[in-house]
Design a protein with these regions (language model features):
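Short, low-order "capping/linker" segments at domain edges
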Residues: 125-142
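Alpha-helix C-cap/termination motif
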Residues: 53, 109, 141-142, 167, ...
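Generic hydrophobic alpha-helical scaffold/packing signal
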Residues: 83, 96, 100, 104, ...
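C-terminal helix-coil-helix/basic helical segment that borders enzyme active sites and/or dimer interfaces
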Residues: 112-116, 140-155
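Midchain, well-structured core segments that form catalytic/ion-binding scaffolds
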Residues: 1-127, 156
Length: 177
């Protein structure tokens, strides 16, 4: 079954975040340490509290956190993997900017530092209506292929092809996926 086009792929930005603190003995001198567990915890709670955007779907997820070296040691390093998504590239940008501010502020609040490494990104996409209709017509009439009744689907995923499609459409062309 041919699906002539799609829409609904969310724009996304993915980061690896490394928090740096200062190790100390949790029982002997906890005040000497700079606990990244506090920074990470503060960041996580506030990331999930980002106000959602009225212009469309928005998402945030903390996928993994790895931290600590022992139960009696103030953690001095943590790695967190996060992603934000938005129904449009603009909504994703809103989520990204909010997330970066939260992460940097959480680190600073607890006397830690952080570095953020961009691990991936994709823009939102929407197939060109006229091209979707043409693909549908060619598949049905010329190639005699079955065509899905629903021409598009919202799957909540993201697609790298969005960069190419958006560039083609910005130049006046048509694109479908």
């Amino acid at each position: 079954v041919v699906i002539p086009g799609s829409y609904g792929s969310l724009a996304t930005t993915k980061y690896d975040v490394i928090f740096h603190g200062k190790s100390a003995h949790a029982g002997g001198s906890p005040e000497v340490g700079r606990n990244v567990m506090l920074a990470v915890g503060t960041a996580i709670l506030n990331l999930y509290a980002i106000p959602r955007h009225s212009g469309g779907v928005s998402r945030v997820n903390v996928g993994t956190v790895v931290a600590g070296s022992g139960r009696n040691v103030i953690a001095d390093e943590a790695k967190m993997e996060i992603e934000v998504r938005g129904e449009t590239t603009e909504i994703n940008e809103y989520m990204k900017n909010y997330a970066v501010n939260i992460i940097e502020s959480a680190a600073k609040m607890h006397g830690c530092t952080c570095e953020m490494k961009l691990m991936g990104a994709a823009n939102s996409l929407a197939s060109s209506e006229a091209l979707m209709e043409r693909v549908k017509r060619v598949c049905e009439e010329d190639l005699h292929l079955p065509v899905a009744k629903e021409m598009s689907s919202k799957n909540g995923g993201s697609e790298d092809v969005s960069y190419m499609m958006n560039r083609v459409q910005e130049q006046g062309g048509q694109a479908t996926f």
